[in-house]
Amino acid sequence: GPAIDVLCQAIEMIQPDAYVDLGDVGEWGAFSAWKWKRKTKPPLEFIVPELEQDVEDVNKGMDIIDEALDKAKCPERHFCEGNHDNWLNMFVDAHPYLKQYRFDKAVKLADRGYTYHPMGKRLKMGKLYFYHGNQYGGQYHAANHIRKLGCNIMYGHWHDLQQHSATHVDGPKSAWSIGCLKDMAEESNTWLQNRAINWAHAFAVVDFYNNGLFTVHVVQIINGRTSLWGELIDGN
């Protein structure tokens, strides 16, 4: 969609030294336990074609971003596994003979050149940590992350934009929730049952300086458009 197109144009413009995907690279509806909550689950052979379609679709989406990273010659790539991604691992736990659906295998992370950070594991760059974001929630989840982790942390999961700062004896720290890039159309999110949401399309540009210090520039995308470094990026 347009938000992903904006991200790809930004990657080519920024020429980043590293790229971090914060996870939930797909909705993974076919693997969801919720899918069979109100109906009888059919035999496995009837489910597999849908699983295959999900894997194919998500890989195509990742190919689009990887193409931009390749063009920008981005040498370092990280993937922080999300809770939706982890549904694939849970499926393999239930069906151990279908190991090809384990998340990192299904999306070929190693072949794509990504370092894989399993769900809940944090990636550290300079004085900033990254992970999916599902461990601490609530209305003020950025404040909750700072309170529980006590470090600079950047995450996704909650789909909205928040920043909260705190100071400790060793200096100030912040938590950033940097939105999402998912399809926010009503028909793609029927599970919300028409609930109003505060989700936002966004990504972040992080610059690192000496001694692990860094600055964060959160770039919000509105209706498939944003402005970065004085340039309009239109993904429509």
Outline where the language-model segments fall.
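Core catalytic region of metal-dependent phosphoesterases/phosphodiesterases
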Residues: 1-110
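Short C-terminal domain-edge/linker segments immediately following a structured domain
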Residues: 18-25, 50-54, 108-113, 157-166, ...
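A short C-terminal boundary segment appended to hydrolase-like catalytic domains
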Residues: 208-236
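A generic local structural motif
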Residues: 5-7, 64, 116-122, 138-143
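Alpha-helical hydrophobic/aromatic positions enriched in membrane-embedded helices and signal peptides
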Residues: 16, 74, 118, 124, ...
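Acidic carboxylate-rich catalytic motifs and surrounding loops in phosphoryl-/glycosyl-chemistry enzymes
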Residues: 76-83, 117-121, 217-221
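Active-site-proximal loop/helix segment associated with metal-binding centers of metalloenzymes
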Residues: 93-126, 158, 177-185
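Conserved beta-sheet core of the metallophosphoesterase superfamily
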Residues: 125-219
